[in-house]
Amino acid sequence: MLQISKLISQGAGLAPVLVKRASTLEIDWDVRQKSRFDALDSLGRQLGVFLPRGTLVRGGDVLIAEDGSMVRVIAAPQPVLRITACASHGSAFDLTRAAYHLGNRHVPIELKPDHLKIEPDHVLADMLRAMHLTVQEVSEAFEPEGGAYSAGGHGHTHAPAATPVPAAVPPAAHVHGPDCNHGHDHAHAPQAIKPVAIQIHPRKPHSH
């Protein structure tokens, strides 16, 4: 088994001619959302993919094998629901409402300017049709949004954020009021004694 532990997002920085010559790996979203899986490439090689946890593999990404060879990922067609606005009974804004309701249900969604795509679900399909949307069952590649905090399959790393250093705050003075009846569990530092200047006048002779 040929092991793979590196991914270059969309083949960034690689010569297009080399990417074109690379073997291919056609897999659907169910596999590509996993960071570890086994698969066969177009050359019949058994691949063991071990990527950092949370990595999403996208169509167009390039995997680098341990022997230095490249494998270009193709998003395989799969059954999906294609959702479009109904020109007769609705408006394009209905897609925005649909994306909102699907997002509240944490449904993976592929967003396009004129349509949405989700994995097959007859309950959601009925809900969307009730919202005056057109729902079609098709076989297409599925590339849902990865989320704002997803690793997203980036082929680079980000430097760690600097740790903020808290400003030193002097401790508040400890004042005992007349109603303060708690016991001392600490010592007070001795207060410095300020010198007091005493003026001495010469004594005048006493005359009778």
From Swiss-Prot:
Subcellular location(s) of the protein: Cytoplasm
Listed transmembrane segments: none
Primary residence: cytoplasm
GO terms (BP aspect): protein folding; protein-containing complex assembly; urea metabolic process
Keywords in alphabetical order: Chaperone, Cytoplasm, Nickel, Nickel insertion
An example Gene Ontology molecular-function term: unfolded protein binding
One term under GO cellular component: cytoplasm
Region feature Disordered, mapped onto this chain: 145-165
InterPro entries cross-referenced by the UniProt entry: UreE (IPR012406), UreE_C_dom (IPR007864), UreE_N (IPR004029), UreE_N_sf (IPR036118)
NCBIfam families, per database record: PRK13261.1-1 (NF009751), PRK13263.1 (NF009762)
Function: Involved in urease metallocenter assembly. Binds nickel. Probably functions as a nickel donor during metallocenter assembly.
Family, as annotated: Belongs to the UreE family.
Protein name per its UniProtKB record: Urease accessory protein UreE
